[in-house]
Amino acid sequence: QQSEYFFDYSLLFIVLFLLGFGLIMIYSASSYEAYDTYGDAAFYMKKQLVANIIGLVGMIIIANIPYHFWERFAMLGYVVSMILIFLVKTPLGISSHGATRWIGIPHTGFNLQPAEVAKLCMILFLASLVCKMGKSVRTMKGFFIMMGAPLPIAACVYLITDNLSSAIIIMGIAVLMVFVASPDYKKFVIMGLSVVAAAALLVFVVVQLGDKIGGKFRLARIQAWLNPESQAQDKGFQTLQALYAIGSGGIWGKGLGQSMQKLSFLPEAQNDMIFSIICEELGLFGAVAIILMFIMLLWRMMVIANNAPDLFGAMLVVGVMGHIAIQAILNIAVVTNSIPNTGISLPFISYGGSSALFLLAEIGLVLSVARRIQLKEL
């Protein structure tokens, strides 16, 4: 009987490959800093390995639980996400690099990032909401309800944890899920044009203000994006070092472990900027290979979403697909200076325990949906 059901080994293999590759690149990118700071070249890699193992165990457990089990916790997840975000402002809050975005879990040594919890819970909540609203999601009222639901969470993530990139991802997930549930192109064309117009206006204002920006952090980042050389010792330093890494890698790269920029030149080499180290050590070939792996991952999710047994399963997979796609695109765009630096990790590859745990939980949900697909439906 079980053989009549589908299990996506291709999806599982791609995820395992990205995790394994990520561990190799984290070791390569962080070994110098880790040895200099902690006396152990594999310090960051070991911590990530532990997070990956815990995440994989969680993924397997979630994959074997019927995904409808989680629907009853959708509203609870929304509330818990909000509470966790506010806990950042309590003594439990952990600061790093000038931002307080983590909660310290007592007696564990683990720091939890509430924004990662919010992304997963928002996918669950919106998938449940789409099913409850039914055809009314296609009305203008339904559209505003769906787009308004994630706004409080996204606003709190931005205002309380100062995490613009996660707020953008949460709203991006909502836009994609609403679009799939209600493919009314006019609303989304208008929304897209409005966002582009607002972004263009913001860039114009930054260009006109010039040196008057002063201490306004976000606007200063946009100015550094437009002309990183003018702030080579300040906001533009990380971007320039990342571009040097990408440019020096050429087509085939310098070779694994041969990066120069990781030698304390490039800040956050093992985290937000790990793609630039991939480009430096493995060249354009390595960068394209990783992008193709992400495309294959998204394609497998699209196949699962198209064949999901019901709407809730399909919307879960669409939400996870949107999360990974948006985050990967934003990370690569930041590293290549296509958009202003927002501080965002590369899924499955960058260093970060919270990100790995909750991304693997999302993959568990996708595999759970895939397991309920009957082979005769494919």
Language model segments and positions:
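Transmembrane helix boundary and interhelical junction motifs in multipass membrane proteins
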Residues: 163-168, 254-259, 269-271, 288, ...
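N-terminal membrane topogenic signal
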Residues: 2-15, 70
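Hydrophobic alpha-helical transmembrane segments of multi-pass inner membrane proteins, especially
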Residues: 16-20, 28, 38-235, 276-337, ...
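TM-adjacent membrane-interface loops and short helices in multi-pass inner/ER membrane proteins
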Residues: 224-271, 285-286
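Short clusters of hydrophobic/aromatic residues that line enzyme substrate/ligand-binding pockets
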Residues: 103, 112, 137, 251-252, ...
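A juxtamembrane structural motif centered on a specific transmembrane helix
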Residues: 1, 5, 327-378
